[in-house]
From Swiss-Prot:
Family, similarity comment: Belongs to the SEC6 family.
Descriptive protein name: Exocyst complex component SEC6
Other known facts: Present with 1080 molecules/cell in log phase SD medium.
Keyword Acetylation annotated: yes
A Pfam family hit: Sec6
Example of a GO MF term: SNARE binding
Organism this protein belongs to: Saccharomyces cerevisiae (strain ATCC 204508 / S288c) (Baker's yeast)
Length: 805
């Protein structure tokens, strides 16, 4: 397995590895496998068809070659038959050859005599065409120039071959005769180069005729090159066979001498002599070597495109370098013209559109690579990725590219690197933004020099959360605008991580500040004069904790809105990733809100330390401790209720009710004896819980959850009174019923009650506690064996101090 698949697997399995996640990964990999198999089958079918077609063509070629050989054999047979059928054939043959030689010599003489005039005529035509704008005139003499120049070059090449078989004097004469031709060829090449540069402009100027004539020249040159290459290969093969035959006929001594020659002569085939013989026999009647004008065309197209990109690079330099991304439409316009107009003017097998596209892609890729290597800012990276997306979409929509044919102008590896670079830059910037935001909002939270803000409903809030999600939304909006799902998911993932860190920092700050406030309160109660400047704690912590709690609800709403809005813009796979990342932050917001709520409760009940310490004491039976507790809670709750989000307040009041009861029962740790005579204990209990009940009924007035909240919390007090007042022999039965409700309770409650009951001896207490503990363990074992999963109860956190001693 390559490193890329390994990295992909690592990316998939990092983080949460729940069964659901494993199933999702499996489904994703199966989908990818199906896609790959489909693509492989599609490509296999395509290439199988091409191979099948090639085999058919090969068989056809084989049959054609066989047919040609048969026809050649028939011609040879007819020639031999005629040769022996005619009297004095040799004399006639030599006379014919002599006549042909005289005729050829006469023709060469005439062409040499008129060659200078021909050169002057061609040059005049070339000068005239080079002086005019071909896009306006249409270059009317183009085909004439090419025809005349081609004839002149053919004549020159043939005469040069002949001269090499003659004297050196003849060779010098020939060189002098044709010395002017090279300059004229250069002018013609210059004309062709200019026309090649303007091929696309010909279509714009409606000079389609000129484009067709230009391509006709290149087409003729290509066909003539192919023809002479085939002839040269035939001559080469024939000469090599003759050479091999001559070596075999040499005596052994001469062959040995040839092998021992330290500097053997290198012969280049076809030889000049071989070409000369074919010229004289009439096999070669035009050029003697390929001229490569097809490559001249391709190079001209490539150079013209490179030159256009060079001009563009010169235009966009320095600070304007990245502005080039907004001025790329001309590339698509050029390619559209090539596809719709130019491609119709030249032979289909040239695939002229691919020639243009490949060079445009090469130059564009080079340009984009340079931009990427310039370490662009985040917004520029997005522009680059957006252009790449536009480039690919345009190829599919306007040029008919299939999904497999489309390729990234950046390059797949470079694109992944760009994704990472963008996300890394975003993380750096977002970390800086969040860091600055946290510093500002924590300073406000710790100093508390002004009260929190209030919205139109009177709910308290701080500015930090709104500002934080404005940053988040802005970056997500930018990422969504790129139409790159990976970018969008990456931004959501990174920002979710930052939100999680921010949540942890809030929990830490809240915990520290509550601890500081409690410490201040305790020192103040003991001796106000002992408080140092370091101990000083600004007021308003309650209001700020309410504001922080409310902010978490808003933050959760923001996160859900972002998930809903932007998840719809991507595929199901990416949508699930976005949802998972943002759902992870929802738990964090709930934790911060819970931390704030519990902090409020800690502060509230810290004010009630003294009355709770007197519960079950002698003064309690006729005292007003419960009323004092209720009045204090009422004062707090009346202030908090209109300032706290209603959903949060329900959860908050649930915790307050539970804490009221837990603190009440915790008074068992002082081991005050219950006074059950004349039902004094029972009456005091009823009195207190009537007070608490009325308090919470009033606070929850109008709330649909009122009865449920009060009932589920106050039920424990019924068990408490039964365990405290019923006969000893019924305690275990009551305990059994208690466990059915409060399955996660400790034994502490029963121990505390038994220690406070005068009618229970030490030995009886130990026996009951032992049996009750066994019942507790047995009940939990049964739950586990039966796979019962229940919600935690209020009594899960009830602990008495003497249990720690």
């Amino acid at each position: 397995m390559s490193s890329d698949p390994l990295q992909q697997v690592c990316d998939l399995i990092k983080g949460d590895l729940s069964l659901e996640r494993v199933r999702d990964i499996k489904e994703q990999l199966l989908k990818e496998k199906s896609v790959v198999e489909y693509q492989l089958n599609k490509e296999s079918d395509k290439y199988y068809g091409e191979v099948e077609e090639s085999l058919k063509l090969l068989n056809l070629s084989k049959n054609s070659v066989t047919s040609i050989k048969q026809q050649i054999n028939e011609v040879n047979k007819l020639g031999n038959d005629n040769r022996f059928a005619i009297n004095r054939y040799d004399i006639l043959f030599r006379a014919t050859k002599l006549y042909e030689t005289v005729n050829t010599t006469s023709s060469i003489y005439d062409r040499i005599y008129n060659f200078v005039a021909l050169m002057e005529h061609i040059e005049r035509l070339l000068v005239a065409e080079l002086a005019e704008d071909a896009l306006e005139t249409g270059c009317p003499h183009l085909l004439e120039i090419h025809f005349l120049l081609t004839s002149a070059r053919d004549f020159q090449e043939q005469v040069v071959v002949m001269a090499k078989e003659a004297t050196e004097d003849a060779q010098r004469t020939v060189m002098k005769l044709f010395s002017r031709l090279s300059g004229i060829i250069s002018k013609f090449d210059k004309l062709l180069d200019g026309l090649t540069y303007d091929i696309v402009e010909m279509a714009r100027a409606e000079q389609i005729s000129l484009a067709i004539r230009l391509f006709k020249i290149y087409d003729l040159e290509e066909r003539e090159d192919l023809r002479i290459e085939a002839i040269r290969n035939i001559i080469k093969k024939k000469e090599i066979e003759i050479e091999k035959s001559s070596i075999k006929k040499l005596p052994n001594s001469k062959n040995t001498a040839r092998l021992q020659d330290e500097t053997p002569k290198v012969i280049e085939y076809p030889t000049n002599k071989g070409l000369y013989q074919e010229i004289m026999s009439g096999t070669i009647s035009t050029r003697t070597a390929p001229r490569g004008y097809k490559h001249f065309l391709i190079n001209g197209i490539n150079n013209s495109i490179s030159e256009m990109f060079g001009e563009m690079r010169e235009k966009y330099v320095g600070d304007q370098k990245f502005d080039v991304l907004d001025n790329m439409d001309w590339i698509f316009n050029e390619l559209i013209i090539v596809k719709e107009h130019i491609a119709n003017c030249c032979p289909p097998h040239w695939n002229i559109f691919e020639v243009y596209f490949d060079q445009y892609y090469k130059e564009l890729h080079s340009l984009i690579t340079d931009l990427v290597e310039s370490e662009p800012e985040t917004i520029i990276i997005l522009d680059i990725l957006a252009f790449d997306k536009t480039f690919q979409d345009t190829l599919k929509q306007d040029f008919g590219f299939t999904k497999s044919e489309v390729k990234s102008v950046i390059g797949d590896k470079e694109k992944e690197t760009l994704f990472k670079d963008y996300l890394n830059l975003i993380v750096v910037k977002m970390t800086e933004w969040i860091g600055n935001l946290e510093k500002a909002e924590f300073d406000v939270f710790l100093e508390r020099s002004t009260p929190p803000h209030s919205d139109s409903d009177g709910l308290l809030f701080l500015d930090g959360t709104k500002t934080c999600f404005q940053m988040f939304t802005q970056q997500v909006e930018v990422a969504a605008g790129t139409n790159q799902a990976k970018i969008l998911v990456g931004v959501v993932e990174r920002f979710s991580d930052l939100l999680t860190k921010r949540q942890k920092n809030w929990i830490s700050k809240i915990s520290e500040e509550i601890k500081k406030q409690i410490n201040y309160n305790h020192k103040y109660d003991i001796d106000p004069e002992s408080i140092t400047p370091e101990d000083e704690c600004p007021g308003g912590l309650v209001e700020y904790l309410i504001a922080v709690s409310n902010d978490q609800m808003k933050a959760a709403d923001y996160a859900v809105a972002i998930s809903s809005k932007y998840g719809k813009l991507v595929s199901k796979v990416y949508e699930k990733q976005i949802t998972n990342h943002l759902e992870g932050t929802l738990d964090g917001f709930a934790e911060v809100a819970q931390c704030s709520s519990l902090g409020l409760i800690t502060l509230m009940f810290d004010d009630l330390r003294k009355p709770y310490q007197e519960i079950f004491s002698k003064t309690w039976y006729m005292g007003s401790q419960a009323q004092q507790i209720a009045d204090t809670l009422d004062e707090y709750l009346l202030d908090i209720k209109p300032q706290m989000n209603s959903v949060l307040f329900v959860n908050f009041i649930d915790n307050v009710i539970g804490e009221t009861i837990i603190k009440f029962l915790t008074a068992l740790s002082f081991e005050h004896s219950f006074k059950n005579k004349n039902n004094k204990f029972l009456e005091a209990m009823k009195r207190d819980f009537e007070i608490f009940y009325q308090l919470f009924v009033k606070v929850l007035d109008g709330n649909e959850s009122k009865d449920t909240l009060i009932t589920q919390n106050f039920t424990v007090m019924e068990f408490f009174m039964d365990l405290s007042c019923e006969p000893i022999d019924s305690i275990l039965d009551i305990w059994q019923k208690y466990l059915e409700v409060y399955w996660d309770s400790r034994i502490d409650l029963l121990v505390g009650i038994l220690k406070c009951r005068k009618d229970v001896s030490s030995s009886e207490r130990k026996k009951i506690v032992q049996q009750a503990t066994e019942m507790l363990h047995e009940y939990r074992r049964n739950m586990e064996a039966n796979g019962v999963d229940r919600e935690p109860t209020l009594m899960r956190r009830f602990v008495l101090e003497f249990e720690k001693q």
